[in-house]
Amino acid sequence: MAQVMDFKVADLSLAEAGRHQIRLAEYEMPGLMQLRKEFADEQPLKGARIAGSIHMTVQTAVLIETLTALGAEVRWASCNIFSTQDEAAAAIVVGSGTVEEPAGVPVFAWKGESLEEYWWCINQIFSWGDELPNMILDDGGDATMAVIRGREYEQAGLVPPAEANDSDEYIAFLGMLREVLAAEPGKWGKIAEAVKGVTEETTTGVHRLYHFAEEGVLPFPAMNVNDAVTKSKFDNKYGTRHSLIDGINRATDMLMGGKNVLVCGYGDVGKGCAEAFDGQGARVKVTEADPINALQALMDGYSVVTVDEAIEDADIVITATGNKDIISFEQMLKMKDHALLGNIGHFDNEIDMHSLLHRDDVTRTTIKPQVDEFTFSTGRSIIVLSEGRLLNLGNATGHPSFVMSNSFADQTIAQIELFQNEGQYENEVYRLPKVLDEKVARIHVEALGGQLTELTKEQAEYIGVDVAGPFKPEHYRY
């Protein structure tokens, strides 16, 4: 166990309110609740010490308590400075104890962290006293990056200085590593050796994992949870379809019907965005670099354009690419007066927030938390949500519980798979086995009252599958 019950959250007095919300979410998260029942006696995560970094929401609270119910010890931070629901964080810290004597899980997260505080929190999930974490559960790859780059700079004996074009966040990251190197030399190398595996939640984090693997610096096996079908085709699309509109409504009360909307990117998240706006009666255009995705958008009835072509007429612009430099400062200058700009990709670098926040000829007016008006020297202004970070979590509470039950059941199963099968996986990136993906889907089909058709032995043999599945080959595209 960690030496002390340490934590840092906004307000422990919010714990009771958080507990009520967690109980409600449990009814909408059948995947996690089923896993608790199935593995209660087996305790497959007994001995696991999980460093967790996922948005500290009510749904994540159900995930955390599922991991601990299966035997794990956990320390937790959020993966975004704005996404924490403070009542959920408080409830997890208090656990079965009281506000005066909390007895839950150490959480280091609160809504509205500074960048320096954010990286301090990430460091805390790796600080286990006399022990070391042996599993990582990540969203966006920041926790994994801390271990890999931290070890690299330890070996070099120096954390490099920030460069002129480095983001404020990366500068804060280097500052954290510099402090740790001075105070705890060798920390990251020890952690890299102790960790049995990492499970990664998002597209952005998965890209980082593949990059680390190509570099030859991935020190442990990684499970790509994002590309599990029950994650990418449900969380990314259906979750976004719900939470994007929720975020915009809470932020602005803007009517979307009849508005010109530009969605940048038509992957699974972009598809959810376009469908959401279409359902509200907006006129949707899409930007896309991939010709296959672009063709899908056209066949779905959307115009495919470039940013430069469509930015001047757009009332709402949403980035959903997982890439960087999608909306430049020059393009923002061309936007309609009081047009809305937001991002639903993992990081804030899809929009040139650096220019908005640091240029002398731009004036910032905070309308309310995570809603800012930026006025240009021309007199025109735009409304930016969550400082260019995930608006569905900064301006709302993220995806609904049921869809997160899919994703977090995948995470739990992936943690069990890597933890129990040490030595069977190389230091590479793996997909969640199809049989486990189908298991998660089956639980949720039953929860929604669906009735699955059972193949006869002859039918199964005819298409070359087992009667119980898996029903599709790994390469099948759903």
From Swiss-Prot:
Source domain of life: Bacteria
Key word Hydrolase present: yes
Gene Ontology cellular-component terms listed: cytosol
Cofactor note: Binds 1 NAD(+) per subunit.
Reactions accelerated catalytically: S-adenosyl-L-homocysteine + H2O = L-homocysteine + adenosine
Subcellular location(s) of the protein: Cytoplasm
Any coiled-coil regions, as ranges: none
Record pathway: Amino-acid biosynthesis; L-homocysteine biosynthesis; L-homocysteine from S-adenosyl-L-homocysteine: step 1/1
Main subcellular location: cytoplasm
Known EC number: 3.13.2.1
Residues annotated to bind NAD(+): 202-204, 236, 265-270, 288, 323, 344-346, 392
Record key words, sorted: Cytoplasm, Hydrolase, NAD, One-carbon metabolism
Family statement: Belongs to the adenosylhomocysteinase family.
Role summary: May play a key role in the regulation of the intracellular concentration of adenosylhomocysteine.
Protein name, entry field: Adenosylhomocysteinase
